[in-house]
Regions:
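Glycine-rich beta-alpha junction loops
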Residues: 33, 98, 117-122, 145, ...
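Hydrophobic anchor at the start of a short beta-strand
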Residues: 3, 25-26, 91, 110-113, ...
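Rossmann-like NAD(P)(H) cofactor-binding subdomain of soluble oxidoreductases
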Residues: 48-130
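Internal alpha-helical scaffold of NAD(P)-dependent oxidoreductase catalytic cores
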Residues: 87, 106-112, 127-198
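Hydrophobic Val/Ile/Leu positions in short beta-strands of Rossmann-like dinucleotide-binding domains
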Residues: 5, 69-70, 141
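Residues at the C-termini of beta-strands that transition into short coil/loop
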Residues: 30-32, 59-61, 95, 117, ...
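Short, charged/polar "capping" segments at the starts of alpha-helices
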Residues: 34-39, 100-102, 147-149
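NAD(P)+-binding Rossmann beta1-loop-alpha1 motif at the extreme N-terminus of oxidoreductases
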Residues: 1-50
């Protein structure tokens, strides 16, 4: 399958590297100023051991891909979408909040967007170099994407990702939003989703 990652910071870089390490074709979409000198191999340092993989890098997505993973910050989404010049088979957003799903469905079409959430503490320490700080990566996806993503999700479990397909999209999205609100409100120090280095 052909994959692209829009927002190759901490979260996007981690996911993109993991997918590429499984032998999938991955293109990281980066800002033009970061393109020169971007490494041909990307890596993630993890508590369970580092992974390294080859990945392509581009400023825009000109050709269709099977999966477009989106991991921009929410306020950057609309501007970032200007880099996507083709229509992916499916779009998997890993943003915080819930409003981005309707934005993406208006842009790409309802059925192409497969809501998802990710919980991990990660950091981009240099172009193409990422660190997973937490011992876990929890990836939950809408059950509507199981036919397309079931194979890749099963292989991500081999990399110690905890992955689930959730039947109810609202439950999927709001459960994380409420968890983040509780942690912010009560000062819980556990970091569920750290997006440093975008």
């Amino acid at each position: 399958m052909e994959h692209a990652v829009l927002g190759a910071g901490a979260i996007g870089g981690l996911v993109g590297t993991a997918v590429a390490s499984l032998g999938e074709s991955v293109t990281l979409l980066v800002r033009s100023e970061r393109l020169p000198g971007y490494p041909a191999n990307v890596s993630v340092e993890r508590p369970s051991g580092a992974i390294t993989a080859a990945a392509k890098v581009a400023v825009t997505l000109a050709n269709p891909v099977d999966v477009l993973w989106i991991a921009t910050k929410t306020y950057q989404l609309k501007m970032a979408l200007q880099a996507v010049h083709s229509l992916p088979r499916c779009i998997v957003p890993l943003l915080n909040g819930v409003d981005h799903v309707e934005v993406l469905r208006a842009h790409f079409g309802h059925d192409r967007v497969l809501p998802a959430t990710v919980a991990v503490e990660a950091e981009r320490i240099a172009p193409g170099r990422f660190v997973q700080r937490s011992p876990f990566v929890n990836l939950n996806l809408a059950a509507s994407g199981e036919q397309v993503l079931g194979g890749i999700v099963a292989r991500l479990r081999d990399l110690e990702f905890t992955c689930k397909f959730i039947q109810n999209e609202q439950t999927l999205l709001w459960s994380k939003a409420l968890l983040q609100h509780r942690r912010l409100h009560y000062g819980d120090l556990d970091c569920c989703d750290s997006r440093k280095g975008h």
